């Protein structure tokens, strides 16, 4: 049963099918943000706008790993958000009914994570009726994204092995 649920989760993301995704989640499922432990989305009413925003921004989704058992599955994929490549791991904790009860998301590399924040944050805030927060988030993430991209390109390689 868990493999079917993980397959629905995967297929929903690949095809951007929000209804299919919601069918894989328990009605009171929780999604934990990859950005902070202070934000989570609970239940279909909160998951729907999150999924709509995610599916509107993620491109070239390619799953490469699906492993686990009847209680927990881990699916990992690569995608693009804006000009950044990301790799996301989703830890899917399944309920006794085989539906997703909880998802914890992990995203790498840092420029991709910040690009995700830059794209998703304002859109999610807007869909939640928080227009001022949406404007603030749209402005606040830009310098962070520029700094992270610059550091990733110029500073981080200085710590790596000489080649």
Model regions and ranges:
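C-terminal and inter-domain tail/linker signature
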Residues: 1-163
